[in-house]
């Protein structure tokens, strides 16, 4: 221990080391150009989605107020053309980012919370608790998640909240198994035994030692789960089981297919939402892989 550390309180030392770890992680992350590019594009997309109500008028999405012709090609007035109802495809694509990202982030938070809770509980307590929770997890793993999400969306009232719940309740098993494996690794280390020998209870061991060790891996996995949630949301909307009143990228694809945009060669109704989905998922994947490379010691070698 250095002289500086002896003059600091244990809490101050812990916070300083955490700041140093965060700074080191950020430096290692920024070295990866693909991950950094993905993060920048995601930041621009999220900021644009948040500021869109200030920068644009949502009334342009109203079919009764649309003043463009049906399926007009891209022009100086409508950069990405219009849909079957005369609405601007560019405006719909921008507003669709709000719903798609909202569902993606919200469903991911729900699934990660469920998966982390089940994974830590199963690994920490072991025994019959682990057996029951893991069999429950395996049951959800063997079920087709998309089919289960469609069933939930069909049974529950249609709406954005229903889509979030349907995706969140079907996307957690992989996170649970990942967290359980990491928790078992952490709890096999000597400092966990010392904490228990000193009288540390379950909450102390999990909160002070297990959870901080699991969170970096959960963070890296979360970015990948968001991309999967965005795809699931687009799929549900495309199949017609999403929110019928919401403008999302999947709903745009579903509308284009049902209204004959494909048969009429109106590619501008298909490419913008399709490219938006691909780019957002690609960016989340790049960021997730970058974080995994930084936070997983085995991938650094």
Task: State where each predicted segment sits.
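Glycine-rich helix-loop "coupling/hinge" segments at transmembrane-helix boundaries
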Residues: 141, 152-155, 182-183, 225, ...
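Transmembrane alpha-helices
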Residues: 98-114, 203-235, 284
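Hydrophobic core positions of alpha-helical segments in small-molecule transporters
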Residues: 37-41, 103-107, 133-136, 149, ...
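Short helix-capping/hinge motifs at transmembrane helix termini and TM-loop junctions
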Residues: 52-60, 123-127, 152-158, 170, ...
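Generic hydrophobic transmembrane alpha-helix motif, especially the helices
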Residues: 79-83, 89, 110-115, 120-189, ...
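Short hydrophobic alpha-helical segments within the ABC transporter permease transmembrane module
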Residues: 89-93, 136, 179, 192, ...
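Gly/Trp-centered helix-boundary motif
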Residues: 1-116, 120-121, 128, 146, ...
């Amino acid at each position: 221990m250095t002289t500086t550390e002896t003059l600091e309180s244990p809490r101050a030392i812990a916070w300083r080391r955490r700041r140093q770890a965060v700074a080191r992680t950020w430096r290692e992350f920024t070295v990866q150009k693909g991950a950094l590019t993905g993060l920048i594009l995601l930041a621009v997309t999220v900021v644009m989605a948040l500021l869109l109500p200030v920068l644009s008028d949502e009334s342009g999405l109203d079919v009764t107020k649309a003043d463009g012709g049906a399926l007009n090609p891209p022009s100086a007035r409508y950069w990405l053309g219009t849909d079957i109802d005369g609405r601007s495809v560019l405006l719909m694509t921008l507003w669709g980012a709000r719903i798609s990202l909202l569902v993606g982030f919200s469903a991911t938070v729900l699934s990660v919370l469920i998966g982390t809770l089940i994974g830590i509980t199963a690994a920490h307590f072991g025994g019959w608790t682990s057996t029951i929770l893991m069999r429950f997890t395996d049951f959800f793993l063997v079920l087709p998640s998309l089919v289960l999400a469609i069933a939930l969306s069909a049974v529950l009232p249609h709406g954005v909240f229903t889509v979030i719940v349907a995706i969140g309740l079907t996307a957690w098993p992989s996170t649970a198994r990942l967290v359980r494996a990491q928790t078992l690794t952490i709890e096999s280390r000597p400092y966990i035994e010392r904490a228990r020998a000193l009288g540390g209870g379950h909450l102390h061991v999990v909160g002070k030692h297990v959870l901080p060790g699991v969170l970096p891996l959960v963070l890296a996995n979360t970015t990948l789960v968001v991309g999967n949630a965005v795809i699931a949301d687009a799929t549900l909307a495309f199949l017609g089981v999403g929110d019928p009143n919401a403008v999302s990228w999947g709903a745009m694809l579903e509308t284009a297919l049902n209204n004959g945009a494909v048969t009429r060669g109106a590619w501008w109704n298909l490419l913008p939402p399709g490219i938006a989905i691909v780019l957002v998922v690609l960016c989340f994947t790049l960021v997730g892989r970058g974080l995994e490379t930084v936070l997983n010691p085995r991938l650094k070698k």
